[in-house]
């Protein structure tokens, strides 16, 4: 039976075995009469070591490359990784030795939660993973050395002629965190200071040094994905060579409205095989919306409500292994989500066993909680002080509604919008209502007030255009961007 009284044997049969098989391992019992060559790609149960039998030994190319310690459902697996370490030390004659460990990849699981530890380097820390690595993944890991790649990265000059000093600082901070084996980190840079350029340069350095081969660049909207693809295509990685001439850059399909009419380009759509069957020789960047990746991982129902953009018609659920990407970058990761959306956002990022870098101008609480370490921060005040941003002048636009709120009298005819369906109907107020200034665009909208504010902004923008010959970049911070009652859409 399942639940608190579920035995370890039942947990293994009903939970752990299926998850190993889903990752491509064939679960078989140990047989002393069989040679090691018979166990290639197998999870061998009760595999003998000098410190007792391992629950599962993951075998590749006549060697044990992984050990899985199993516990019943009610026990937390993190604390039993030490048992897997004992088996690793006790598997003498395995042809591998990493400072006394003879098996490099260790797991502990209760069938629901999986903890993993790569013991090849003392700085590596155990971490929770969404599933077991595939045989192909562990084979690839054995052929890669993050320590050597980090050494190569440290020796790689960061001298791109368009880099600003603080952007070099950001790269240095990220690279130091990776060298320390941190897996989640946040880069916070003020709007207008070149976050995307900084990260495109960062991606190139990580790929050139061998720290990363496959990089996922996640954004929130297709238009932002199109801009990111263009940023990679325009980046001159080496003198006379653009990024996409050195490494492949892929994206999802775009709609016409996603593309900047002044900069037309033909995006390369990622072949599905790159996601479901990642190869050690692949080296590419994939730019995707987080909504599409959520569909790819968990199906269309999981992505409901994450965006007001229509679903991509060609998006479907795929069997994507957890090692599909070495680095995942979440751009503009400060966006506010509902509790359900936040859970889906986290699940999507958590699926990948990758270095995760969050990029934002304004770190939200959920962002800092997930990415943990703000490894670099470049704030607006410092950017102004150093001359990279121009300070703003405050212009007061007086609005009685924004100061005093709105008073609606009994019997007034008002439009009522259902925020769920978007349906609108006219109704007569039965009682008078007072809305404070803080309620504007949250509980009640004032179209005339919005119009007057925009007219005032337009006046200053047109003056700027006449003086400098171009319409100024303008950021408008809407109160909300909710389906059917969106202040942003009305503006």
Give the predicted meaning of each segment.
Residues 108, 286-289, 329, 355-360:
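Structural recognition of the conserved hydrophobic beta-strand(s) that form the central parallel beta-sheet
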Residues 368-472:
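Interdomain helical connector at the RecA1-RecA2 junction of SF1/SF2 helicase-like NTPases
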Residues 295-298, 401-407, 486:
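Short, solvent-exposed loop/turn elements at domain surfaces
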Residues 481-491:
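Conserved helicase motor "Helicase C" RecA-like lobe of SF1/SF2 P-loop NTPases
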Residues 303-357:
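SF2 helicase catalytic motif II
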Residues 75, 224, 292-295, 332-336, ...:
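Residues immediately C-terminal
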Residues 1-214, 219, 223, 227-242, ...:
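ATP-dependent helicase/translocase motor core
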Residues 216, 475-477:
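Conserved beta-strand elements of the Class I
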């Amino acid at each position: 039976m399942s639940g608190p009284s579920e035995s370890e044997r039942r947990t293994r049969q009903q939970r752990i075995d299926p998850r190993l098989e889903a990752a491509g391992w064939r679960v078989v019992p140990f047989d002393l009469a069989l040679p090691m060559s018979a166990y290639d790609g197998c999870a061998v149960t009760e595999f003998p070591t000098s410190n007792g039998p391992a629950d599962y030994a993951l075998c590749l190319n006549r060697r044990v490359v992984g050990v899985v310690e199993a516990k019943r459902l009610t026990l937390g697996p993190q604390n039993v990784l030490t048992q897997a370490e004992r088996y690793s030390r006790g598997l003498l004659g395995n042809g591998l030795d990493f400072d006394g460990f003879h098996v490099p990849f260790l797991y502990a699981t209760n069938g629901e939660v999986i903890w993993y530890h790569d013991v090849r380097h003392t700085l590596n820390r155990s971490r929770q993973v969404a599933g077991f690595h595939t045989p192909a993944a562990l084979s690839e890991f054995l052929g890669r050395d993050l320590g050597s790649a980090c050494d190569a990265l440290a020796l790689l000059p960061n001298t791109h002629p368009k880099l600003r000093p603080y952007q070099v600082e950001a790269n240095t901070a990220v690279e130091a965190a990776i060298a320390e084996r941190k897996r989640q980190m946040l880069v916070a840079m003020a709007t207008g200071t070149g976050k995307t350029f900084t990260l495109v340069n960062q991606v190139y350095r990580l790929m050139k040094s061998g720290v990363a081969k496959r990089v996922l660049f996640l954004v929130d909207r297709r238009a932002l994905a199109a801009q990111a693809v263009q940023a990679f295509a325009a980046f001159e990685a080496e003198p006379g060579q653009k990024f996409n001439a050195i490494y492949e850059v892929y994206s999802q399909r775009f709609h016409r409205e996603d593309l900047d009419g002044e900069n037309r380009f033909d995006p390369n759509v990622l072949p599905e095989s790159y996601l479901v069957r990642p190869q050690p020789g692949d080296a590419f960047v994939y730019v995707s919306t987080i909504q599409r990746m959520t569909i790819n991982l968990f199906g269309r129902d999981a992505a409901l409500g994450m965006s007001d953009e229509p679903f991509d018609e060609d998006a479907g659920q795929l069997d994507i292994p957890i090692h599909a990407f070495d680095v995942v970058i979440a751009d503009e990761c400060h966006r506010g989500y509902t509790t359900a959306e936040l859970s889906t956002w986290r699940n999507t990022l958590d699926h990948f066993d990758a270095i995760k870098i969050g990029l934002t101008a304004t770190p939200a609480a959920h962002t800092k909680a997930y990415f943990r370490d703000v490894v670099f921060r470049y704030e607006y005040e410092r950017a102004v002080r150093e001359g990279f941003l121009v300070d703003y002048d405050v212009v007061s636009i007086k609005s009685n509604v924004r100061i005093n709120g709105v008073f609606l009298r009994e019997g007034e005819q008002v439009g009522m919008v259902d925020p769920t369906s978007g349906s609108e109907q006219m109704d007569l107020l039965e009682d008078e209502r007072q809305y404070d200034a803080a309620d504007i665009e949250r509980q009640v909208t004032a179209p005339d007030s919005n119009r007057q504010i925009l007219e005032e902004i337009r006046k200053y923008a047109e003056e700027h255009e006449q003086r400098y010959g171009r319409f100024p970049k303008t950021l408008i911070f809407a109160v909300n961007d909710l389906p059917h009652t969106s202040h942003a859409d009305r503006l």
